[in-house]
């Protein structure tokens, strides 16, 4: 419990919130679909904080890297690889939301991590 509270504190301290922007922990909570920081797994918080600092490069990542990041299901990762091979790089969030298995709501939640 102490560890998660420390992680939450550090995450909140590291991100400035101006009323419009969500903090790192708020972005993680939204992605994970939880209402409270205590409901987050500390491992997931560390992994996702790392992605906030070094976003996943979806146009360059291999299938294994896409799956390893933990943002996409196997189906979504395969679908993205297939899309890239047929159409080239994904150039916008709206283009990504058109990839099979994605959608505007999902892309909005993962956008800070990619």
Predicted ranges, named:
Residues 4-13:
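Sec-dependent N-terminal signal peptides
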Residues 19-20:
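Boundary of Sec targeting at the N-terminus
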Residues 30-37:
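Structured, non-catalytic alpha/beta "coupling" segments that mediate domain-domain communication
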Residues 38-39, 107:
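Long, solvent-exposed N-terminal ectodomains/accessory regions
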Residues 42-91, 110-113:
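Amphipathic, charged-and-aliphatic alpha-helical interface segments
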Residues 92-108:
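Hydrophobic or amphipathic alpha-helical targeting/insertion segments
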